[in-house]
Each structure stands twice: as C-alpha cells, then as structure tokens.
Design a protein with these regions (language model features):
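Primarily recognizes the serine-hydrolase "nucleophile elbow" in alpha/beta-hydrolase
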Residues: 250-252, 257-306
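A domain-start/cap signature at the N-terminus of enzymes
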Residues: 85, 89-178, 496-508
C-alpha cells in the first residue's frame, strides 16, 4: 500500500475518495476504484473493499488501463488484498476473474488469427523464374481488417514470448499500400516482456503525437515490447525481433516496402540508430528522440549512415547524451556528407516527448516520412561491420571477416572525444561533469566493403573481408548480357545470370519484400587463385 504516516492518513485518503465518488459519480474510473479498494482492504473495511473491488472488476471503460481480471489475479494482488484472502467473497471474485482471463486470451487468439488471415496463393509450384518474379511484385492476398488495433503475440524462442501492438489507419484498405513506422520504447533495462499490450499503454501520453500524425497521414504504427535481455540496444539476443516483425506485418498488411521507418525515444532511439548501423536494408529512414548515437554491442561505424538517413531530436538539458557531444556528432556527420539532421529544443530535459512543445518535432518527422522512400537498388554501397550476423546491406550479403588481413589505408576509424557530460546531483539539479571518454568503442576487428555498379559492371573494394555475395535483381542489370565483377581491380566474374527459383522463394519468405527481390546470388571468395568457378545453382566466383 502507498505509504502514510499512520492509519489516520489512510483513513483520510479513503474518506477523500468516497466524497469524490459521491460528488462526481460520472468521473469514477479504474485508478480511483483500484486505489480505494486497496485502502479499504488495508484498513480492514471488508465490505467497502469488496464493494469497490467488485465495481472495479465489473467496470467496462472505453479505454481500459488493465484487464479487469488482472486486479485480482496480478502478481501483487494477494499482497495488496491480503486482508481479504480468507473471506469467501475473495474466492468468488477470483473464480470470476479466472473465467474473465480465459475469455480475454481466447479473444486475443481470435483477433490474432483474423489479423493474420490472408487469401494467399502458394507460389511453390511456379517453376519459371521470370513468372515467379512477376508474382512477387503483385499486391496479392490482403484482406480487410475488422479492427483498428491488434495485440499480436511474438515468439522469441520455444519458451519465451512477447507481443507487438499494431495500430491501423482508420479506413484501412487492403488494396492500398501504406507507410509503416515502428516505435521502439526506452528504458529497456527496466521493461518486461508482455504477452499482450493494450491501446492505453502505447497510443497515448508520451506517444500521443505518433498516434495523431499517423492517423492524419494514414501510417501504420507498430509498437514492439522488449526487456532487459531481449531488446534493440544492450543485447543482440533481441535484435532479430524487429526484422522478423516487419516480415510478419508485411505478410498480412499491404505495406509499401520502400516506406518502412523506425523511431524511438531514449534507449529506443539508440535502438533505431543501431538498426541504421547494423541492419538497415528493410528501412527507408530512421528517427530518434533524445538519442545516444552509439552501438552498444560492438563498433559504431558511422559511415554506414550514408546508406540511409537519420533525424535526431535532441534537447540541451539531457543527461542521456549531452549537447556538446551532439554538436561534435553533427560535425562528424557533416564531414562525411551523411543524410543527417539534428533539431535541438532548448530548455527541455530527457523527457521531451512528455511536453506539448514536442509536437513540432513530430510534424518534422512525419513530413520527412511522407517524402522519403528507400532506394532498394542503390548504385553505391559502403558497409563496415565487426559481427558476421550483420554482414548484409541491400545487394551485398553474407560478408565474412578476414581477421588476419591487414587493414587497407582507406579503411579508417572515425571517432571523437567527449569531455563534458550532464548528470543530476544529490539536489536533483543538472550539473556539468568533466569526463574523458571516446564517443565509440571498437571491441573487435572490422571489415569494410565499398561497391558500385553500372551497365552490368560491379566494382568492389574490400578491406579485411574474406568473402561475400552479390545479390542480383533484374532492376539492376540487363539479364541478356554478362555480369562482370571486379574485385580490388581484378576481374573475378564474367557470366550471364539466370533465375534461381529456390533462392528466390527462400529469400522472399524471409523478408516478404515485394520490391527488393533477388533472383540469384553470386558468391565471391578471395584468395583461391583462379578466375572463377560455379557451384550448385548459385553462381560462385573465387579470386
């Protein structure tokens, strides 16, 4: 129970609530009934406790803050209502709550099945590659949705699951493609996985402007739920979640593949930045509120931003990442001609989205989102990585490290020093702290690849890279002509490329991308001493 100096304080609180209920009966809500029922239980006012607890259980608000059964079956319930446990009325309520919980989960399952319902035709029997490519490009199988909001379960592994929440445009039309925006929550170290989410948890309060502008501009919103172990910032254990959820959503909703975006606040903004650094291919653009622009699971290779874009909404009183560091980071971004913008809002702390003054930032975000599109087949790519799980970027994939190789002269580290940080002192005042730290850590050796193509000719330079694959699309080459690949100035592949239907199906089932479709793959491996060789259905070259 909430702390008071003595029983008199609890009694006064109970009396205050009851007077308010009497004066304003139309304003009785979940929070009030919950608090007064706990107070009455603590004061051993059994009849009042059961009266208000029953009203709480039977309340049907338009926007519930918790399922009604959770107040009775929650992990804290037996402690909060410990004085009621021996009363037969508690057991009666508990039995009703158990039935309500069962019904709640049954309805979740029904809604989830309806969410995933599609009228999809199997493509496994299509053996002609060109025809299969045409089928992939179609917007097929999508159905209308009965609801605007869906809480969808998500299996992390065989024994652990969480959820993601989907908010659709009001008049969602399955024949129309929509932009998709992910929001990553912060405070990942203090969050827990949840097998369901409610609209009241994600669409309002600090997220109210996401909801407002998404509804105004017909953007699909997705809110995943992470935890200390499974998240998008501090651990790679949960980094797979967002790409997997993208594929699941694309399977059932008509998403514009070139307009998938990701945003977040605090740890969530750092998560959005991490996908930009490590796994950007699915996305068109990245945004962050109060961002700490650093990869916490490995090196931060800032030139990777040149493959996409980032907009950072910062404040000058942020303990999470100080304004002087943001200034230096912006200067670094400008020096490499990155598509990066920072908008500084002075006078605000780390909790910037809490304030109404943050609304213009969301206007900027959605204005950019509406104009921006992914280039699925960029003419040039620059990619650096230190973990082979993230050796993929657009039409380059399966990039493997050569940790014994000597770094090329053009393969340079970019970093800067941070000398000042903001922190709260014992009086809860924000003060400047002198520090001596580098902006980024580099715990492992990295590899880098720079590639470009034009007129069926690919020119690729590598540093500390052992092998890689070049993904091929008919949008990139003339299928009637040979493809030539020059690796570090030497011709290593010179052949025509055909369609590989098995590879096409496997890749499509993984990404559900109807635009960035690969019809074959050329594998390049250094150091074999022969011009090239072919292996299986995939084209393989060794140099």
């Amino acid at each position: 129970m909430w702390q008071a100096k003595d029983t008199v304080g609890y009694r006064n609180s109970l009396d205050m609530y009851e007077r308010a209920f009497s004066l304003f009966p139309d304003s009785i809500d979940e929070d009030g009934l919950y608090r007064v029922s706990v107070l009455a239980s603590g004061l051993k006012e059994y009849d009042k406790a059961f009266k208000y607890l029953t009203l709480l259980f039977e309340l049907k608000p338009n926007l519930p803050w918790a399922p009604n059964w959770s107040y009775i079956l929650g992990e804290d319930s037996e402690n909060e209502y410990k004085n009621l446990l021996s009363d037969v009325r508690w057991n009666d309520l508990r039995q009703k709550a158990l039935k309500a919980k069962q019904t709640f989960y049954e309805e979740l399952n029904v809604n989830e099945k309806e969410f995933y319902a599609v009228d999809e035709v199997s493509l496994c029997k299509v053996k002609d590659g060109k025809a299969l490519y045409g089928e992939f490009r179609k917007k097929f199988g999508y159905l209308p949705k009965k609801s605007q909001n869906y809480s969808v379960s998500f299996a992390i592994n065989d024994s652990i699951k969480t959820s993601f929440f989907v908010h659709l445009p009001k008049d969602y039309n399955p024949n129309k493609s929509y932009p998709l925006l992910f929001f990553l929550h912060g405070a990942v170290r203090y969050n827990q996985l949840s097998d369901y989410q409610l609209a009241s948890w994600v669409l309002y309060d600090w997220n109210r402007y996401y909801t407002k502008y998404a509804e105004r501009n017909e953007v699909i919103l997705v809110f995943p739920k992470g935890s200390r172990k499974f998240n998008w910032m501090t651990s790679d254990d949960g980094f797979f979640m967002i790409p997997k959820i993208v594929a699941l959503v694309k399977k059932t909703l008509n998403v514009d593949d070139d307009k998938v975006f990701i945003s977040g606040h605090s740890n969530g903004a750092t998560g959005a930045f991490s996908y930009l650094m490590k796994q950007p291919s699915l996305f068109a653009g990245f945004y962050g509120f109060n961002t700490y622009p650093k990869v916490f699971t490995g090196g931060t290779f800032v030139e990777n931003i040149k493959n996409r874009s980032f907009i950072n909404f910062s404040t000058d009183k942020d303990y999470y990442y100080p304004p002087n560091a943001n200034d230096d980071f912006t200067q670094l971004m400008n020096s490499i001609n990155a598509d990066y913008k920072e908008f500084r809002y002075n006078g605000f702390s780390h909790s910037f989205p809490q304030f109404d003054e943050s609304e213009p930032a969301y206007g900027i975000l959605f204005s950019d989102l509406l104009k921006r599109q992914r280039n699925p087949f960029p003419k040039e790519i620059s990619w650096e990585f230190d973990d082979e799980c993230y050796g993929n970027i657009d039409w380059l994939s399966n990039i493997k490290l050569d940790t014994l190789a000597v770094r090329k002269d053009w393969h340079k580290v970019k970093n800067f020093k941070i000398n000042r940080w903001l922190k709260y002192d014992e009086k809860d005042s924000l003060v400047v702290m002198e520090v001596d730290r580098m902006a980024f850590d580099f715990p492992r050796k990295s590899g880098k690849i720079v590639a470009k193509y034009e007129n069926n000719i690919f020119r690729i330079e590598t540093s500390c890279v052992k092998s890689f694959s070049v993904n091929i699309s008919p949008e990139m080459i003339d299928m009637g002509k040979k493809v030539r690949i020059y690796l570090n100035g030497n011709l290593c592949f010179d052949k025509r490329i055909g369609y590989d239907t098995d590879f096409m199906l496997q890749n499509f089932n993984t990404t559900r991308d109807k635009i960035q479709i690969w019809i074959n793959q050329i594998h390049i491996q250094e150091g074999q001493g022969v011009p090239y060789s072919c292996k299986s259905k995939k084209q393989m070259a060794t140099y």
